[in-house]
Amino acid sequence: MANCKEFYFPSSNGVSRIHAAEWTPDGPPVAVLQIAHGVAEYGMRYAPFAEFLTEHGFVVVANDHLGHGLSAEKDAETLYFGPHDGWKHVVDDMYALRCRTKEKYPDLPYFLMGHSMGSFLTRTYLIRYPGTVDAAIIMGTGQQSPAIVAPGRAIAKAAGKRHGFTAHSPRVESLAFGAYNKAFAPNRTEVDWLSVSQNNVDSY
């Protein structure tokens, strides 16, 4: 049975606290996996997966990124990384968790897994902190042409200036995710594309 311990550590932004969890096996650990979750997720959402891995000897750690889960201390902070260098701070927080965990398990192989938004954070992490993990798993990633990204960024920036950068924008959300569900019509929910499991979709 997995042992789970939740804790907080200071964010690299110098203001926030980052919520995290560590799952440990009953027996001697064989490796460490750090998870970088996706947008609108949180680390504890991966608890069943983490518990499965502990049965095979893994230590698993996952934090809630800035603006997510228990790292978002106010409703206004939900999905908001911050006013300055937010992406950088999220990646630096991932590195801080890695350093904290590696200090506890210095001799174990260390792996980093990023899903969806977490995959892009992981790619940035590998550029900023090369050689600090033994391997990486990049799931649900992709890329877009600058010709598509630039207008989307301009629309998001304009929406932020008009309504506030912590406000929810249906237009920006539609631009980011709207096309995904078209492949799964007729749709039961707005996020049918997320998983083949209806339970996973409903819990999300």
Predicted features along the sequence, with ranges:
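Alpha/beta-hydrolase active-site loop
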Residues: 82-102
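Active-site glycine-rich loops that stabilize anionic/oxyanionic intermediates
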Residues: 30, 37-41, 116
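Alpha/beta-hydrolase-fold enzymes
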Residues: 122-203
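Serine-hydrolase catalytic-loop signature spanning alpha/beta hydrolases and amidase-signature enzymes
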Residues: 35-48, 60
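Conserved alpha/beta-hydrolase
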Residues: 48-76
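N-terminal cap/lid segment of alpha/beta-hydrolase-fold proteins
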Residues: 1-27
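Glycine-rich nucleophile elbow surrounding the catalytic serine of serine-hydrolase chemistry
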Residues: 114-124
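Alpha/beta-hydrolase fold nucleophile elbow
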Residues: 105-116
